[in-house]
Amino acid sequence: MYEYIRGQFQGISKDYVVIELNNIGYKIFTSGNTMSNMPKVGDEVLLYLEQIVREDFIGLYGFTTREELEMFKLLLSINGVGAKAALSLLSISTVNNLKYAIMMGDEKHITRAPGIGKKTAQRIILELKDKLKPDELTSEEGQLIEGINDNSDYSFNINETLSALMALGYTEKEAQKALEKVDKTLSIENMIKESLKLLMR
């Protein structure tokens, strides 16, 4: 079992990042929040890990904070919520805002996550509401639940940009390489424009 990995950030894809350690590139699935906290390519990063093993799959899931890792594991404890759904939930807002939504029974916020329907949202609220501590959140953090979090669409924007570049005839590898050098806080349109400038050099 792995506790964490410390290595060089080497790239980002639709739902994972690549971390190099001792000349080995590790594919680590993660959330939009963690993706938004990645440093420049080549810089060092530390991710807290959870390994998932099934008959047909072995995968590493990593996060920049222990808090997000613990929330990921808590979500996995719910029947019907797998790793993909948990990452989707952790990509729509900060961990604190997600906790606040659960404690307040805010189904609307939770169903913003792709792949999360009303019944699943209700199950999440029912099973986790009493496990979360209200005193861990400030009123300011709670108020943010009504707004748009800066990272809420981060993962979605990356996916859309990659898809657009591939639709223009570039391979996934080419698109990813260009996108690694582009500011991920830009809009989809501007990320595409900046990526194309790099690809057409």
UniProtKB/Swiss-Prot annotation:
Keywords: Cytoplasm, DNA damage, DNA recombination, DNA repair, DNA-binding. The keyword Transmembrane helix does not apply. InterPro entries: DNA_helicase_Holl-junc_RuvA_I, Hlx-hairpin-Hlx_DNA-bd_motif, NA-bd_OB-fold, RuvA, RuvA_2-like, RuvA_C, RuvA_C_sf. GO terms for molecular function: ATP binding; four-way junction DNA binding; four-way junction helicase activity. Residues 1-64 are annotated as: Domain I. Residues 144-152 are annotated as: Flexible linker. Pfam families: HHH_5, RuvA_C, RuvA_N. Belongs to the RuvA family. This is Holliday junction branch migration complex subunit RuvA. It comes from Clostridium perfringens (strain 13 / Type A). The gene is ruvA.
